[in-house]
């Protein structure tokens, strides 16, 4: 008998296990199991007849296939082959196949031909018998189908002749059907070879007309998708749109979902089902497309996305995902579109590690939508209470359909640029005291002016004032406020202008009613821009106290020592004042020190004359509120000559009735009244600053006198007084140098004043001083 003729699958399967009279006897194993094989064995008719007649009631069959026990021919392990076709491996070499109540008494009664022992052909027949219909209830129709499945006479003439002779002997016997011997009854026509295996109560193997390979892909706790259920899960053979399940994924396509959630299945003619088995040497390997077995270490899922893979019907190239630990060494495949692969050669698939699924959300959420554009990618999970992103994007900001919120910079550029504070560069809140500043600098300036604080810089009076460091140095911040042009008079002026505008509005309303009246408009309006004079008013040092005890009897030594100590503090205040003058800090640092060393006595003498003029009507010398030199104290030794020069200044101020604005401009010009003969390092800038304050003095004169022809005459008188200050200061310095060098007088000098005198003495002795006079003698 040829080996090719050993196994031939029939078009329709016989539900009962029978031995046919054509080309041997046919025995059907496990008809309920899909993928089962039809085993044909050659049995002598006499033995079968004897077995049938001897015990007609016996219906159980025990077929034992030990190694080398069937006619000295190598017996293949049929149980192992059949079980491997189902994805189950039974490790026992000697497997017993249990059938219904019919048994063979001896092993030698059944013999297999050598051509029918080819295991590879058996595997091919198992693969071709994957799909079968349920067991029919009519045994006659089954028998007829079994007979029709037999080969034709012209194909097997020899076999037909042998069997036909045996059929004549079996005619008319009980338990036969058309010459075929019935091995089982109609209700016991199945042959369970998996009886020894333990299945759960819901296993499809315990049900009739079912197969474990018809079950849909399920989700369990230990793996992403599994063809078999766990110990506690049952197979779900049927599903509807209301169940949370994942539709079956075809190898080359993706499922279509209707609006109601039903799965649209393609016809079998267009889409072929995936092949369930692959041949690899001596065992059968199951490949489930689109499934990766996960390890049991942790419930972590791998999510892969390939953009452009939503087109159904296109041929997709498989990408092997290596590194997956499997027991059989299988290779699993993902599907991706070849067109998208060619467009994105440099891009790699995005794998996102998804955290473990909570206990209450272990099922897949249904895929909703219709059409090709609404297909859900494989591996997309929905978690309760979490935002679901598309597979192709790791964050919502990467998605082209999600627009990012407009940034603050883009909105800032669309509108007008913010106005900055001129002091600290913070965002300005408005115009305060004549300057565009923030609220913080506004409050600071008001408190600094009204509180008359004597701020001192711990550095070199060049601290950086910005939004962060504006509170570090109040002295530099106050100076910067003055340089920006802040003054308290601007607020008063603004109120005056507002009152004038309101008055003008009221008058205009009255004149509109009476056209005969003329509109009253003020001749001049005060300027809102702060002037240098207003800045000089702000930076003017406060009056210092000498701390002189008037209860103690006066003496020349005591008065001179107290005046020197007061002079030292006044010099410090003068340095601070000079650095706050607009434009002075632009000079070179050496020029600033030189000007202060040359003019410190000018500043002290002129300020003393101003205080005496304002408080004592030029009859007394008011050094401090608690130290006033009267006529009685002037009579002390070495006091009258010095007091006489100082009274001259106060008397001239009283005679000219100098205003406060004029005094401030004249005092600033005295700071710039003496320079070295060689000139300053920034001489041009110095000349420009000096000319600026000369003009300011002229403005102060015009402000006091108005549009009068006496302005130039007053300017001459004031500048003449400035020139006379050189002679007064020269006499005072000579006496100061004398008392400093004469140690017998024991007059104390503060450290600051002593340092200045020490540096100034050589310059005076060498004649390295140039006087800047307004008028030639």
From Swiss-Prot:
Alphabetical list of Pfam families matching this protein: GCR (PF02155), Hormone_recep (PF00104), zf-C4 (PF00105)
Modified residue annotations for Phosphothreonine: 8
Residues modified as Phosphoserine: 45, 113, 134, 141, 203, 211, 226, 267, 404
Keywords, ordered alphabetically: Acetylation, Chromatin regulator, Chromosome, Cytoplasm, Cytoskeleton, DNA-binding, Isopeptide bond, Lipid-binding, Metal-binding, Methylation, Mitochondrion, Nucleus, Phosphoprotein, Receptor, Steroid-binding, Transcription, Transcription regulation, Ubl conjugation, Zinc, Zinc-finger
Cellular compartment(s): Cytoplasm; Nucleus; Mitochondrion; Cytoplasm, Cytoskeleton, Spindle
Domain NR LBD: from-to ranges: 524-758
Ranges where the record places region Modulating: 1-420
Chain positions with Omega-N-methylarginine modification: 23
One biological process term in Gene Ontology: chromatin organization
Cross-link type Glycyl lysine isopeptide (Lys-Gly) (interchain with G-Cter in ubiquitin), residue numbers: 419
Cross-link (Glycyl lysine isopeptide (Lys-Gly) (interchain with G-Cter in SUMO2)): 258, 277, 293
Gene3D superfamilies: Erythroid Transcription Factor GATA-1, subunit A, Retinoid X Receptor
Compositionally biased spans, kind Polar residues: 164-174
Processing and modification events after translation: Acetylation by CLOCK reduces its binding to glucocorticoid response elements and its transcriptional activity. Increased proteasome-mediated degradation in response to glucocorticoids.
Known DNA-binding region: 421-486
Cross-link (Glycyl lysine isopeptide (Lys-Gly) (interchain with G-Cter in SUMO)), chain numbering: 277, 293, 703
Subunit structure: Heteromultimeric cytoplasmic complex with HSP90AA1, HSPA1A/HSPA1B, and FKBP5 or another immunophilin such as PPID, STIP1, or the immunophilin homolog PPP5C. Upon ligand binding FKBP5 dissociates from the complex and FKBP4 takes its place, thereby linking the complex to dynein and mediating transport to the nucleus, where the complex dissociates. Probably forms a complex composed of chaperones HSP90 and HSP70, co-chaperones CDC37, PPP5C, TSC1 and client protein TSC2, CDK4, AKT, RAF1 and NR3C1; this complex does not contain co-chaperones STIP1/HOP and PTGES3/p23. Directly interacts with UNC45A.
Similarity-based family: Belongs to the nuclear hormone receptor family. NR3 subfamily.
The protein's name: Glucocorticoid receptor
Gene: NR3C1
